[in-house]
Amino acid sequence: MPGSALLCCLLLLAGVKTSKGHSIRGDNNCTHFPVSQTHMLRELRAAFSQVKTFFQKKDQLDNILLTDSLLQDFKGYLGCQALSEMIKFYLVEVMPQAENHGPEIKEHLNSLGEKLKTLWIQLRRCHRFLPCENKSKAVEQVKNDFNKLQDKGVYKAMNEFDIFINCIEAYVTLKMKN
């Protein structure tokens, strides 16, 4: 019996050491995240600048899709979920529709989408930035308003993409301080 107990302890310690090794590698990715996050946000802004004028000209609506309540969700306890849902919203709903509005912008939108997807993957990889499961009412409101605008919704959403980048930056900056 003492031999099997010793063997169990050794296996347990080996497992703990292995899991700590994985944790350290994961944390190393997170320690460099603030620098890469700044770079990724700069790349997102640069990629968006390639299509911004196109969507500004097409957006003839006076209402705002990305309201202050969304920014408040990003800064509050629902920040994680709001960020995750908004990234998915842009990747799954907005950008595919936006690509159909002009072949001259499709390549730039693909680039913008890839950069947003890369940011999302890195946020998920570093669990402290995206550890969430709750629903954001502000995001639901954005989606409802987007759908009500029908064809014009894509112009509104893409025109306000820079506001979305600012929300991402506010969220990540807040998380880095904590």
Swiss-Prot record:
Disulfide bonds: C30-C126, C80-C132
Location of this chain's protein in the cell: Secreted
Location, primary (coarse class): secreted
Assembly behavior: Homodimer. Interacts with IL10RA and IL10RB.
Molecular-function annotations in GO: cytokine activity; interleukin-10 receptor binding; protein dimerization activity
Taxonomic source organism: Rattus norvegicus
Name of the protein in its database record: Interleukin-10
Family: Belongs to the IL-10 family.
Known function: Major immune regulatory cytokine that acts on many cells of the immune system where it has profound anti-inflammatory functions, limiting excessive tissue disruption caused by inflammation. Mechanistically, IL10 binds to its heterotetrameric receptor comprising IL10RA and IL10RB leading to JAK1 and STAT2-mediated phosphorylation of STAT3. In turn, STAT3 translocates to the nucleus where it drives expression of anti-inflammatory mediators.
UniProt KW keywords: Cytokine, Disulfide bond, Glycoprotein, Secreted, Signal
Glycosylation sites recorded in the entry for this protein: N29, N134
GO CC terms of this entry: extracellular space
Signal peptide stretch: 1-18
GO terms under biological process: branching involved in labyrinthine layer morphogenesis; cellular response to estradiol stimulus; cellular response to hepatocyte growth factor stimulus; cellular response to lipopolysaccharide; chronic inflammatory response to antigenic stimulus; defense response to bacterium; defense response to protozoan; immune response
SMART domains reported in the protein's UniProt record: IL10
